[in-house]
Each structure stands twice: as structure tokens, then as C-alpha cells.
């Protein structure tokens, strides 16, 4: 039951931050207490803000508020891999895939495992960017279509 309550707290906490209307930790504490989390205090809120990488930024009304930037979220094993891919672009020689931070090496490893049979000669991955080189005789557009199908079907 305690784990269920903690999971619920974390879900509610993230939902509150997504509203982008809380400018102080005390406002977050009050909102959580109003929602029935009586054991919440400023130090717990501070730890949760740190855990989720929350930042203070200006919302659309130019108010300083806490928020959770989605693009900074860390990939986990329950994340569908296609949701980690932000953009696929190319030139005449390479395909470049932009991913969520920290996801590039995971996705590149999967693409390397598919390998030459699907037209991938090799990949180079950083933190959030993958360079893909096609095999000789494989067109860039053809390889992009293959990669997109892989993300839709099996990843």
C-alpha cells in the first residue's frame, strides 16, 4: 500500500508541475496537502524536484514557475523506443537521428543489430544524436523508410 501511495504522489506531483503555475516549493506543498497528501513537507518536495530534474522557468504569462522539461526526461525500460526518437534527417550520405538525451546509444545498438541485411553499414552515437551510414547500393531514402518501419513495427 505504501508503494501505491508513493506512486500516486509522484504521479500527482508531475501532474501539478505540468500545469506550470507553481512558483515556490511552499505552493507545491499546499497543493499536495489540499489533494490529501498530509505527510508532505518542503524537504520532500525539494527532493522530488531534484529527482525529476525540475527547473524554474517562465511560463506563457511570464511568471517564474517550476516545470518538468519533457526533453530532459531520462529514458527507462518502459519507454516505447519510437517515443525516444525526436527527428530523422539526412543528406546525400548520412542519416541523422535526434533522440531524447541519453537514448542515442540504446537506439544505435538496436540499429546495429539489424545491420547490413537492412542496409545499415554502421552507426555512431553520442548522447542524443546518431549518424547512420548506408551499405553500398542502399539509397538514403530507402534506408530512412526501412528505419521508420522498424520504429513503427518492432521498436
Curated annotation (Swiss-Prot):
Family per record: Belongs to the ArgR family.
Localization (cell): Cytoplasm
Main localization, broad class: cytoplasm
Record's GO cellular component terms: cytoplasm
Keywords on record: Amino-acid biosynthesis, Arginine biosynthesis, Cytoplasm, DNA-binding, Repressor, Transcription, Transcription regulation
Protein name: Arginine repressor
Top-level taxon: Bacteria
Molecular functions (GO terms): arginine binding; DNA binding; DNA-binding transcription factor activity
SUPFAM superfamilies linked: C-terminal domain of arginine repressor (SSF55252), Winged helix' DNA-binding domain (SSF46785)
GO biological process annotation, one example: regulation of arginine biosynthetic process
This protein's record includes keyword Nucleus: no
Function: Regulates arginine biosynthesis genes.
InterPro entries noted in UniProt: Arg_repress (IPR001669), Arg_repress_C (IPR020899), Arg_repress_C_sf (IPR036251), Arg_repress_DNA-bd (IPR020900), WH-like_DNA-bd_sf (IPR036388), WH_DNA-bd_sf (IPR036390)
Pathway of action: Amino-acid biosynthesis; L-arginine biosynthesis [regulation]
Highest classification ranks of the organism: Bacteria, Pseudomonadati, Pseudomonadota, Gammaproteobacteria, Pasteurellales
Organism: Mannheimia succiniciproducens (strain KCTC 0769BP / MBEL55E)
Keyword Oxidoreductase among UniProt keywords: no
